[in-house]
UniProtKB/Swiss-Prot annotation:
4-imidazolone-5-propanoate binds at residues 91, 154, 187, 255, 331. GO terms for molecular function: imidazolonepropionase activity; iron ion binding; zinc ion binding. Fe(3+) binds at residues 82, 84, 252, 326. It comes from Parabacteroides distasonis (strain ATCC 8503 / DSM 20701 / CIP 104284 / JCM 5825 / NCTC 11152). Pathway: Amino-acid degradation; L-histidine degradation into L-glutamate; N-formimidoyl-L-glutamate from L-histidine: step 3/3. Keywords: Cytoplasm, Histidine metabolism, Hydrolase, Iron, Metal-binding, Zinc. It comes from the Bacteria. HAMAP family: HutI. Catalyzes the hydrolytic cleavage of the carbon-nitrogen bond in imidazolone-5-propanoate to yield N-formimidoyl-L-glutamate. It is the third step in the universal histidine degradation pathway. It catalyses: 4-imidazolone-5-propanoate + H2O = N-formimidoyl-L-glutamate. GO terms for cellular component: cytoplasm. This is Imidazolonepropionase. Its cofactor is Zn(2+); Fe(3+). The gene is hutI.
Length: 416
């Protein structure tokens, strides 16, 4: 439903998550909650935020579509800052193998894993990838996600990487959600470069990066920096080349073993370092010092039955922590934002306040958009969600249940 002016009034809580940059350490506990609050928006932009009586004194309420939210909490739209939602095929057999005890890396080493999805994605046409991608965006949108990051990395050649990124660009134009695109050509080494990882990195740098940049639709470059995949030196070489082409930088770091990926991300001042299940204490300190967002993916640790990233230690050390789904066909075939929040609180020892911050303003910072989205602040885009309950604390408490009642995206109203 479209309306140029919307007023949410008498909300049990307006959870503002105020600010225009990532919140670090103890700052993550400050949600800026307004009780009996109101939010006014016009032409897709937030114009007034505050106690209901104050907002009503400053607007002509009769000009607005009113939503009375006496028993509802109102939050910024969620930002899912790490996904791989465009892919062909599925890997349900590999999930069964992992249940029998096979490790993620052992499956990858014998031709499964990412290369398995690469084959299916290369065989998929644009329309099929688009249709499946739209379905996944719809699922995320229904759970309150208004901005999503999506990675390529299942083509591992120029042609298919471009197809993945063009699908994301097209969905960004056609779907209510915003899609922030990331080039992840260095996700694995394809069979045609087996045993020649340095040559593959050269190919990425010399041929693929310039062609991706020419598309003018891709914001980030990412790399899977991991033992047995891309070394620290190879990762740094690729990321420095990407920066030369004016990409912002991300890293998959320290997911499988302690590898020094977080330290590299800090030295390169990446926007975010992601996964971090096996980050070192030194890596934590350097991420905090460098201001790199630590994007943690509890659904993946759950799906792989691996130890969770040390969120509590990171926050206490002054890191800015974000949470994301890591939706992908292999290590985490789930987009369950509600389950992710519960896992973060129960197993990673994050408080409900920290989890909300991690999925809003810090998620926005992880995609370089904290000045536009991620908080209910005057001048920001009108990306707002209403819950079915009167407090944000129901998010981890009502485990695994979708509590989103209404989504407002760019000032347009969607009833879930």
């Amino acid at each position: 439903m479209e309306n140029s002016k919307i007023l949410i009034r008498n909300a049990a809580q307006i959870v503002t998550c105020h600010g225009d940059k990532a919140r670090r350490g103890a700052e993550m506990s400050d949600l800026g909650v307004i009780e009996d609050g109101a939010v006014a928006m016009s032409d897709g932009v937030i114009t007034h935020v505050g106690p209901t009586e104050e907002v009503l004194r400053n607007i002509h309420a009769e000009d607005y579509l009113e939503i009375r939210a006496e028993n509802q909490a109102v939050l910024p739209g969620f930002v899912d800052s790490h996904t791989h939602f465009i892919f062909g095929g599925y890997r349900e057999e590999e999930f069964s193998w992992r249940l029998r005890g096979d490790s993620y890396m052992s499956i990858m080493e014998r031709g499964g894993g990412i290369v398995n999805t690469m084959k299916a994605t290369r065989e998929s046409d644009f329309d099929t990838l688009w249709d499946r991608g739209e379905e996944r965006l719809d699922e995320l949108f229904s759970m309150g996600v208004t901005t999503v990051e999506g990675k390529s990395g299942y083509g591992l050649d120029l042609q298919t990487e471009l197809v993945q990124l063009r699908v994301m660009s097209d969905l960004n134009e056609s779907h209510p959600m915003d899609v922030v695109s990331t080039f992840l050509g260095a996700h694995a080494v394809p069979p045609e470069f087996a045993g020649r990882t340095d040559d593959y990195v050269d190919y990425m740098i010399e041929e693929v990066l310039p062609a991706i940049r020419a598309e003018h639709t891709v914001t980030f470059c990412d790399v899977f920096c991991e033992k047995g995949v891309f070394s620290l030196e190879q990762s740094e070489r690729l990321l420095r080349a990407a920066r030369h082409h004016r990409f912002k930088l991300k890293m998959h770091a320290d997911e499988i073993v302690p590898f020094g990926g977080a330290e590299l991300a800090a030295s390169l001042k990446c926007v975010s370092a992601d996964h971090l299940l096996h980050i070192s204490d030194t890596g934590i300190k350097r991420l905090a010092r460098a201001g790199v967002v630590a994007t943690l993916l509890p659904l993946t640790a759950f799906s792989l039955n691996e130890p969770y990233a040390p969120a509590r230690k990171m926050i206490d050390a002054g890191c800015a922590v974000a949470l994301a789904s890591d939706l992908n066909p292999g290590s985490c075939f789930s987009a369950s934002i509600p389950m992710m929040i519960a896992l973060a609180c129960i197993y990673m020892k994050m408080t409900p306040e920290e989890a909300v911050t991690a999925l809003t303003i810090n998620g926005a910072a992880a995609v370089g958009r904290a000045s536009e989205i991620g908080s209910i602040s005057v001048g920001k885009r009108a990306d707002v969600i209403l819950l079915k309950y009167p407090s944000y604390k129901f998010l981890p408490y009502h485990v695994g249940m979708n509590l989103v009642d209404t989504v407002i995206k760019d000032g347009e109203l969607y009833m879930m």
